């Protein structure tokens, strides 16, 4: 449970819980809205990463990594996946938040949750599109450092980030 102590913030209480297969439809719908909303922030088109709008992909991801849902009350407002790579290294993937819940500090809470939920992980990795300045700012503010760029699908550049904990 992550509680917000700021009484001025309209998101008073956010819970982060493991996602289950019955959440796949809701997660796919929120993911679709979140990634397609990025067109307002520089995305070259209305789309997202492979499988972003597929309930089947969401269920498969639950088997490949630790998939979490973000809840406000009983409403799923986002999700993210932690892919453990080994005992001390993990990748944070597919962080997405419902458009009407964005810019409220939830992303920062997700990053803090991941680090606290996986205390053995000392090396975090993630990536974000080069056009998404909002997520770049979030990750850099949280201590992530740019380490490279890739263009895996030939569509746009992803900026790779890492964070090493002491």
What spans do the regions from the language model cover?
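Conserved N-terminal entry element of GNAT/NAT acetyltransferase domains
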Residues: 1-22, 165-166
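Conserved beta-strand in the GNAT
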Residues: 69, 75-84, 91-96
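A conserved beta-turn-beta hairpin within the catalytic core of GNAT-like acetyltransferases
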Residues: 84-93, 102, 120-122, 153-157
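A short, internal acetyl-CoA/4′-phosphopantetheine-binding micro-motif in the GNAT/acyltransferase core
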Residues: 95-102, 128-130
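Conserved GNAT acetyl-CoA-binding A-motif
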Residues: 117-129
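Conserved acetyl-CoA-binding loop-helix of GNAT-fold acetyltransferases
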Residues: 97, 103-116, 137-141
